[in-house]
Amino acid sequence: MKEKTTQLYEGAYVFSVTLSEEARRKALEKVTSGITNYGGEILKIHDQGRKKLAYTIRGAREGYYYLIYFTVVPGVIAELWKEYHLNEDLLRFLTLKTDAVKEVLEFASLPE
């Protein structure tokens, strides 16, 4: 029997600022439990805090940003996306394949 190989992913998630701290924690837990329920493993979560959005999303101008590194079988990503689209607390998400977990996040300064 062929063993299914997992892939390392970097997921960016933006949650609504209207959520209380407890509701935001539960919304994040919903995302992470979705990953683990499909046999994935959470490797690192970076809380980026509250930031201004590049454009208005559902009337929101700000959001809470999280970056999650996780491993999962590639076929599961489509199922996770279906769940994300049903999550009203999640304003936006992006999932990318990556080669390594970033322990420290570095951002370049914008030119003035």
Swiss-Prot record:
GO terms for biological process: translation. The keyword Transcription does not apply. One of its GO terms (cellular component) is cytoplasm. Gene3D superfamilies: 3.30.70.60. It comes from the Bacteria. It holds the Pfam family Ribosomal_S6. Keywords: Ribonucleoprotein, Ribosomal protein, RNA-binding, rRNA-binding. Belongs to the bacterial ribosomal protein bS6 family. NCBIfam families: S6. Binds together with bS18 to 16S ribosomal RNA. This is Small ribosomal subunit protein bS6. It comes from Chlamydia abortus (strain DSM 27085 / S26/3).
